[in-house]
Amino acid sequence: MGIKKFKPTTPSRRHMTTMSFEEITKQEPEKSLIAPLKRKAGRNVKGRITVRHRGGGHKRQYRIVDFRRVKDNVPARVAAIEYDPNRSAHIALLHYFDGHKAYIIAPHNLRVGDVIESGPNADIKTGNTLPLKDIPVGSLIHNIELRPGKGAQLVRSAGAVAQLMAKEGAYAHVRLPSGEVRLIHVNCRATIGQVGNLEHENMTLGKAGRSRWLGIRPGVRGSVMNPTDHPHGGGEGRAPIGRKYPVSPWGKIAIGGKTRRKKPSDNMIVRKRKP
């Protein structure tokens, strides 16, 4: 899928680019696989803002995507490739031979009419899902589980791909897109291939209004706030921040500071990601 450019009829139009949507074959979603999606505008259950710069945006319906792929040994035909407003990747509508329907993340080069399946005995081809123990070392994979049966949690965004590096006993070494090498249990499932919509990262929004369509609100610089609102605030005119380094609204290092939390699963990291 390519990037579509526009004639510069307005200043924003000059830089704006969109996806060409050549892969999309169906406009309306499958009614049995959608659910209402209530927007939270960055608020938690107490109504307090926990994620800033969220709110508004176009109304969406949630597409129920199958991340578990436990329907083993039942082939499915790809009926359509669809747009999903809730993620960067496209989704594929599957029609299983037993009549069941499901959505999956659409891998790169998956086409309408292709037949895919899941299970330990599935072939090593794009779109098939197998346990890591049944996937050859060196294979490119996505949609990776962290716990067997929980459903895919890693490598799901557009263009993302991981590589199975090695297997040792009950665990496999998987290199993630960040460069981190992580131990994952060999009974966890993964899908063969790379996530589709590779050109997504090259798209330019081009104007503020397009961010608002996506539900992203403006981010105000701390230096133009008052001292009560931000550590950078206050002063006469364009005053310097008055610190050695920039900080967040809560006083934590804003550039170069570590933000990743310590978790019990950190002992599964073989090699840390790129700095």
UniProtKB/Swiss-Prot annotation:
GO MF, one example: transferase activity
Alphabetical UniProt keywords: Ribonucleoprotein, Ribosomal protein, RNA-binding, rRNA-binding
InterPro entries: NA-bd_OB-fold, Rib_uL2_dom2, Ribosomal_uL2, Ribosomal_uL2_bac/org-type, Ribosomal_uL2_C, Ribosomal_uL2_CS, Ribosomal_uL2_dom3, Ribosomal_uL2_RNA-bd_dom
Single GO BP term: cytoplasmic translation
Record function comment: One of the primary rRNA binding proteins. Required for association of the 30S and 50S subunits to form the 70S ribosome, for tRNA binding and peptide bond formation. It has been suggested to have peptidyltransferase activity; this is somewhat controversial. Makes several contacts with the 16S rRNA in the 70S ribosome.
Quaternary structure note: Part of the 50S ribosomal subunit. Forms a bridge to the 30S subunit in the 70S ribosome.
Protein name (record): Large ribosomal subunit protein uL2
